[in-house]
Amino acid sequence: MTSVESFIEDLASSTDADFASVKEFPLMPEGDAVDMGHAQDGTPLLDPRILDSPEFFRNPYPYYRILRDHYPVFHDKLHNCYWVTRYDDITECYFDDEGFNTIPKGSSSGVLGNTQLELSGVEHRRRRNLYGQHLVGQSLQARIPAIEKLANEMIDAWETAANDDSEFCSDNGNTRQLELSSMFANEFPIRVVCEVLGFPKEAQSQFYYWYNSMMSGLGGSATHKQGVEARQGLEDYVAGIVEERRKDPTYLLDQDGNPTSKDIITKLCETKVDGDFLSTEEITSNIALIVGAGGETTRGAIMNMWALLLRHPDQFDAVIGDGGNWDKAFHETLRHSSSIGGQPRHNTFDVEMHGVKVPAGSLMQMVDFAANHDERIFKQPESFNIFRDDLYYGKLLRSGYRKEGRCSHMAFGVGPHLCPGAWISHQEAVVGSKILLSRMKNPRINENKMPKDIDGKSPAPMGIISVRELWLEYDLS
C-alpha cells in the first residue's frame, strides 16, 4: 500500500462523525489549491471533504487538476463513489453503454417521469428518436424565427422596466444598467421551450413554476415532494390538451405572425409507435426532459459567455466584427465554464482503471468539468480563447469529434446519452446573444455592482456552475 492509499484508508477508518464532519478550508486565490499535505513521494494528498467545501464550489479546477494528475479514478469513500476525471477515460465510458449504465431507474423518475435518462440500448434509442427529430436539423431551423421573436419581446420590455425604475433595470441619463440574469437569461430559455413546445401564453407563468419546482426537486429530499407535485400538475395539464392537439394542430409563428412549423406537443400528439399513439405519460416525460435539458444549460451558457467575452475585449471585438464567431464563443464557453458538471454511471461488471479496482454496480461520477480542462487534450485549459486550435467548433455530434488535433468539448457528454437539449441550447444562446448585441450599444460590465473575490477588489471566480449575477450597462444612443 502506498503512502497515499494509507492516508485515504486512515481517513476512511475514522469515526463516521469525524469523517463526515464539516471541515473549514481557507479560500485561496483563483488557480491555487489548499495544501492538504503530501505523501513521502511528494504526491499531493486530497481530503474528500474538500469536495463539499465553499472553496471547491468557488473554484473546483485546481482540485480537478490534482485528481487528473494523481488520482484519475479516485475512490471517494466519504461519498461512496469513484470520480473519473480524464477526457479519454470519460469518453470511453460514455461510449460503452452496456458496461456503464446510466442512473438507476427511479432516481429521477419521480420528478421527470420515466425518461430516457434511465434507459439504455434499443428502448433508449426509440425514446430519443421520438422527440430528438424535432430538435435538430431543418426542424430546429424552422424554430429560429420564434426564438428571435421571443428575444426581441423580452428586450422590448426593458423600456417599461427602466421607466418603472426596476431593481434590475434602470436608466441614468444616456446609460441603461441592468442585471442580465433577471432581465433576460433566467426566463428566456424557458419562454423558448414553452413556445416551441406549444404552451399557450396564458399557461406560461404556471409552466415556469412547474419548471423551477421540478429542477429544484431533483436536488434532494427537501424539495422532492414539490417537484413530484409539479410534475403531476404538468401531466394533468398535458392530458387536457392531447386530444385537442390531435384534432386541431397548432403552429409556431414568425415575427410577422406567419406559421413556420407545428409545435412539438402537436408533433408528439400525432406520433404513433407500432400503430399506437404515445400515452399522455410518455408525452409528459418527453416534455419534462426537453424542459430540463433546455433550461439551466442555456441560462448558464448565456451568462458565462457574456461575462467571459466582456472580460476579454479583443475576443468580444472579434464577435462584434463577425457574427459567425458567436458559435466559437458558445463552444469555448462550454469547454471553459460549463454549467453542466457531468453524468453518473454504474459499471455492470468489475473494472480496473489506472490500477484502481471498481466493483460492479459502483457509482462512477464522470466529471465533464474536469475533462474539459484536461491538459492532455486542451492546451492552457484555464485560458478562455475562442480561437484555440485544439477545440472542435462544428456541428454537435453524438459521435463526438477528434481529428487533426481538435476535440469536441464534453459539456453535453458524448455517445448515446449526449444531452437531448444540446442543439436547441446552442441556438437559444447564440441567437439570443446576437439579438442582445444588436439592441445594446457599447455594452460593458458594471464592475461596481459585481460580486468581488476574497481580496475585495478583483472579480469573483465564476465558480462550479455559472455566473449568477451579471450587471451590464450600455449607451442608449
Q: Predicted segment positions?
A:
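Cytochrome P450
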Residues: 2-477
